[in-house]
């Protein structure tokens, strides 16, 4: 993590497994628009806390928790958005005719059936007189 202090210094925070915890890089002017970069280790952390301007978002972006929190935040926004749409749909359809319920399963996709006599189809309805001429071609 890099932090700029008030006296034109930059503080570098190394990972905890490194030997040094903190170091200061100081830019000292040596000419017009030229600077000398010096490295000095920090004497103690409590002494530096009065000079360092803390930037908490630098830690948040580098930690593993930030992507998780960002994903949770976006999920909250999506849930709120769909909740508003759902409530708006309930309010918009109040007092209006709702969609009719279907009487039977599949009734919207098939035409109504023809009436069938209670005795069922008889041979008289299905049979037609066959002539000998038609039978000649079938045999």
Curated annotation (Swiss-Prot):
Name the membrane topology term: Single-pass membrane protein
Q: Where are the transmembrane segments?
A: 77-97
Which Gene Ontology terms of cellular component type are present?
mitochondrial membrane
* The keyword Transmembrane helix appears for this protein: yes
Q: What is this protein called?
A: Uncharacterized mitochondrial protein AtMg00170/AtMg00620
Q: Could you list this entry's UniProt keywords, alphabetically sorted.
A: Membrane, Mitochondrion, Transmembrane, Transmembrane helix
Q: Which domain of life is it from?
A: Eukaryota
Q: Where in the cell is it found?
A: Mitochondrion membrane
What more is known? A stretch of 270 kb of the mitochondrial genome is duplicated within the centromere of chromosome 2 resulting in the duplication of the gene. The expression of this duplicated gene (At2g07722) is not demonstrated.
Q: Which organism is it from?
A: Arabidopsis thaliana (Mouse-ear cress)
